[in-house]
Amino acid sequence: SRLSKPLMETLAVIAYRQPVTVNEIETVRGVGADHSVRALVERRLVEEKGRKQTPGRPVLYGTTDEFLHRFGMNGLADLPPENLFSPVPARVPSEP
């Protein structure tokens, strides 16, 4: 099944910044990520990779072999350069 935009955004953050915590994902995206991470784990695209050695020992997430297979990659080195995904303004200001 296709992934929604929030799931794709969360998956991209995990793919490029792994291992990463939910809090770190939320910092990058600016919105809650618990639901998205849970959905990606259920789809076997993301899995727990351990725990961060900080207070609270939050779970670290990373991509799976299923992620690589589904997106036609042999490894994370096959990811396109992250700078291809620069933010695009929601609207272009009109010229005076």
Language model segments and positions:
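Short alpha-helical segments that sit at the start of domains
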Residues: S1-M8, E42
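Short amphipathic alpha-helical elements of helix-turn-helix/winged-helix folds
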Residues: T10-R17, R70
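Short acidic, hydrophobic short linear motifs in intrinsically disordered regions
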Residues: R17-V28
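Canonical helix-turn-helix DNA-binding module
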Residues: G30-E42
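A short, conserved structural fragment
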Residues: R44-Q53
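Minor-groove-contacting beta-hairpin "wing" of winged helix-turn-helix DNA-binding domains
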Residues: Q53-T64
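Phosphate-centric recognition/catalysis
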Residues: H69-P96
